[in-house]
């Protein structure tokens, strides 16, 4: 009898937790209008902690990162880009609604201002339906499937990036279909989503437009080699498209060394297809112990296309960035991370609102922590 009562209680609270997730997501939209997001976020955390039981249909993690950064350009300190700064605070909510339905939600809590809507700070918010072991359908906000390993770490895990990454809004609303082979070694994904350049187009011209991106991706794991390749067609202006061919390659040399090599070619009409507008990014990582990761990275980007099609790396740009860093994980579960890195950029950036500048040095140290709430 006691076992039946216990089972009934677990089922009851499991249903309550599912209901709470739905209510929470709906209320977040309403709270955006009321401008009380932070208060509500704390409320959700307390409520989910109080109501979740042993049989949980969700997992909730809170993440935060704080840095000290010193930036200089040609030896002159950049005061706006120097000092102690909160980098990111977010929460990640994941779970299963049934054997075939799952969901995931990541919200940054430090990305809101008057020009930045609530959903701009939502990295992903999607529902996944898996009718078979091979096929999945994904609807919602999701990463834009442009390949290359540099684009794939979460923002909280990024240090110094190429100029392309800083100007590519990589989370958009859309639909995707995924096919995984029986061996589980290869996955093929087709996606249609809002163009990452829809909002930049409006900011640039003052005109609204409904623009899309069409993406095909292949990810594979074959021995010591991992692929992350894609072909992409993205609207940068109404009915005007730029094509990406992005080839991400990762090599494992034993258990302690990894090498990542990304190549991206970008081309539009009325320009040479290969080599005029491209990026090359390489990173080598080495783990001498389970608690330490040492890495070095370099990127080279050039655009000599003579067109305005590339919004991310603009015509006339030629930039190089090099750097190295170290990560230390004092805990076995790696929920606390201390990092430090140095980077140096040089070359020409024709984007007046770009990120990288000629002769820019950056020193950064910081700490990241993750707390599993549920």
Regions found by a protein language model. Give the residues of each.
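Bacterial Sec-dependent N-terminal signal peptides
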Residues: 15, 20-55
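Outer membrane beta-barrel
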Residues: 54-70, 80-197, 219-223
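Exposed loop/turn and edge beta-strand positions of beta-sandwich/beta-sheet ligand-binding modules
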Residues: 87, 121, 133, 171, ...
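Loop-centered beta-sheet repeat module
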Residues: 189-240
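Short, well-structured alpha-helical patches and their helix-loop capping segments
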Residues: 162-169, 206-210, 299
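Polybasic, lysine-rich low-complexity intrinsically disordered segments
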Residues: 4-7, 12
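Outer-membrane beta-barrel pore domains
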Residues: 65-79, 115, 126, 130, ...
């Amino acid at each position: 009898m006691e076992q039946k009562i216990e089972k009934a209680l677990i089922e009851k609270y499991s249903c309550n937790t599912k209901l709470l997730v739905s209510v929470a997501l709906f209320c977040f939209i309403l709270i955006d209008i009321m401008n009380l997001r932070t208060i509500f976020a704390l409320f959700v955390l307390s409520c989910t902690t109080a109501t979740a039981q042993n049989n949980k249909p969700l997992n909730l993690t809170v993440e935060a990162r704080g840095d000290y950064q010193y930036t200089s350009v040609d030896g002159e300190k950049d005061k706006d880009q120097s000092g102690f700064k909160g980098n990111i605070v977010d929460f990640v909510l994941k779970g299963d609604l049934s054997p075939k339905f799952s969901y995931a939600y990541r919200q940054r809590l430090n990305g809101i201002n008057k020009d930045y809507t609530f959903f701009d700070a939502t990295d992903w918010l999607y529902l996944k339906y898996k009718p078979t072991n091979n096929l999945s359908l994904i609807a919602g906000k999701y990463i834009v499937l442009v390949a290359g390993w540099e684009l794939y770490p979460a923002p909280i895990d990024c240090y110094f990036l190429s100029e392309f990454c800083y100007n590519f809004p990589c989370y958009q609303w859309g639909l995707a279909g995924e096919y995984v082979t029986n061996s589980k070694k290869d996955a093929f994904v087709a996606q249609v989503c809002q163009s990452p350049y829809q909002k930049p187009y409006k900011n640039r011209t003052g005109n609204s437009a409904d623009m899309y991106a069409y993406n095909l991706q292949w990810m594979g794991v074959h021995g010591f080699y991992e692929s992350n390749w894609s072909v992409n067609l993205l609207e940068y202006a109404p009915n005007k498209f730029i094509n990406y061919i992005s080839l991400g390659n990762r090599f494992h040399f034993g258990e302690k060394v990894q090498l990542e090599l990304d190549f991206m070619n970008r081309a539009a009409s009325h320009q040479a297809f290969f080599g005029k507008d491209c990026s090359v990014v390489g990173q080598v990582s080495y783990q001498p112990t389970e608690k330490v990761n040492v890495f070095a990275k370099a990127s080279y980007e050039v655009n000599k296309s003579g067109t305005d099609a590339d919004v991310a790396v603009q015509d006339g740009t030629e930039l190089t960035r090099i750097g190295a860093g170290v990560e230390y994980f004092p805990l076995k579960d790696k929920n606390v991370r201390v990092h430090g890195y140095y980077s140096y950029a040089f070359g020409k950036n024709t984007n007046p609102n770009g990120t990288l500048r000629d002769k820019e040095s950056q020193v950064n140290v910081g700490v990241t922590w993750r707390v599993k709430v549920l």
